């Protein structure tokens, strides 16, 4: 796109605090945004071809609340991203990310994290440091198991649909706020599903269709009645 068009977008963003430039074939993060590090609250560069975030620029958007780079070509995230202490929404669906920076747990205001359609091979332990996290979407990755660290996760909703999960730590039932757990289209045997999810957790919506067992078999597990009580109570609440 031409410089004048980009300049016009920058001028508008200066007034609104919102910079949105989608579907423009951008191959790099626009360096012109350096001028707006103290203005921007929202950046949306989805549906481009950006393969990296400039470390020296990205960490300076200290007022940024929402960052979207869905459908790009990102392979790594710089540590400097974790300087964004006001960031509440981070959406990086359909990139090529294999892991998160070790400092990711410093994004202390983060509420919504979308990483669907990446190449994550494990549940990132850094997520367990995020005390305000509400919604986590890790669907369509390559996660094979859920480790013990999951018990520290503060999220209300965890989407793990379309991974390769065959093992789940019993600690998942210790998540203090977890209400919605999506595990559709994984590699779970019924025997590998911790019964404590049904009997001893806060979970009131468990989605497990498309695994290696018939859904009706779930009803035979100990604790299913307790789960249905929570499920029904929640349904009534939103009816």
UniProtKB/Swiss-Prot annotation:
Lipidation sites (N-myristoyl glycine): 2
Keywords, sorted A to Z: Leucine-rich repeat, Lipoprotein, Membrane, Myristate, Repeat
TM stretches of this protein: none
Protein's cellular compartments: Membrane
A GO CC annotation given for this chain: membrane
UniProt KW 4Fe-4S keyword: no
Membrane topology: Lipid-anchor
LRR repeat windows: 39-60, 63-85, 86-107, 109-131, 132-153, 154-175, 177-197, 202-222
Keyword Repeat: yes
InterPro entries linked to this entry: Leu-rich_rpt, Leu-rich_rpt_typical-subtyp, LRR_dom_sf, LRR_domain-containing
Pfam families reported in the protein's UniProt record: LRR_1, LRR_8
Protein name: Leucine-rich repeat-containing protein 57
Gene field: Lrrc57
């Amino acid at each position: 796109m031409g410089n004048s068009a980009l300049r016009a977008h920058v001028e508008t963003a200066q007034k609104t605090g919102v910079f949105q430039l989608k579907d423009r074939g951008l191959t790099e993060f626009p360096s012109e945004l350096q001028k707006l590090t103290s203005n921007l609250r929202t950046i949306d560069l989805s549906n481009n071809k950006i393969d990296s975030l400039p470390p020296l620029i990205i960490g300076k958007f200290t007022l940024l609340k929402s960052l979207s780079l869905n459908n790009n070509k990102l392979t790594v995230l710089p540590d400097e991203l974790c300087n964004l202490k006001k960031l509440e929404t981070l959406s990086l669906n359909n990139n090529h990310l294999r892991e998160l920076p070790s400092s990711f747990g410093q994004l202390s205001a983060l509420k919504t994290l979308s990483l669907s359609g990446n190449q994550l091979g494990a549940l990132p332990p850094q997520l367990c440091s995020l005390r305000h996290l509400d919604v986590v979407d890790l669907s369509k990755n390559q996660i094979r198991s859920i480790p013990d660290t999951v018990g520290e996760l503060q999220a209300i909703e965890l989407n793990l649909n379309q991974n390769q999960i065959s093992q789940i730590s019993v600690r998942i039932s210790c998540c203090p706020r977890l209400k919605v757990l999506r595990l559709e289209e994984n590699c779970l045997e019924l025997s590998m599903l911790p019964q404590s999810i049904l009997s001893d957790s806060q979970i009131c919506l468990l989605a497990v269709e498309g695994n290696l067992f018939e859904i009706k078999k779930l009803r035979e597990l100990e604790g299913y009645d307790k789960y249905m009580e929570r499920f029904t109570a929640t349904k009534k609440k939103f009816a």
